[in-house]
Amino acid sequence: MTDADSGMDIDALERVAVYQFGSAAGSALFGGSELDVTRSTSGRPRQVLAPDGRIGTYSTTGRFTLGLAGGRRLHESLPHPDYRVVVGDESEPFVRDGKNVFAKFVQEVDPDVRPGDEVAVVHHEGDLLAVGRAELPASDMLDFQTGMAVAVRDGATDN
């Protein structure tokens, strides 16, 4: 892979991030650091890695699944509550350990979150706890007392 090919990959992947997460996401995820794009055997971009960890995986669906480093970058740059699910003290240690988020523990959520969206799970004090996939729409996360709200992929055990 040449440097020009890598730059083209980053530009294309940045456009996907803008489509998926909004206009500020492209520069948040892909700006300011040296990135490595791994490829599948067919040559398709697969993993986007940075010195601080995995930004995300570019799936066959044409969307990103967030890694913890990507969730941290979005959390630091997107306005609150975009792509966030906020939980309290009761579930914080479990979510940080990589356990799923249940609806009864959700205190706040971006009203535009839909099932299948990638989200950052944050503590009400602002710490990133995990990243994962929303399983319920935002309104149901707040209304339901049972059910899984977010399938956690990576917990922030290092914080």
Regions found by a protein language model. Give the residues of each.
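Solvent-exposed alpha-helices and their adjacent loops that cap or buttress functional pockets
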Residues: 39-41, 111-114
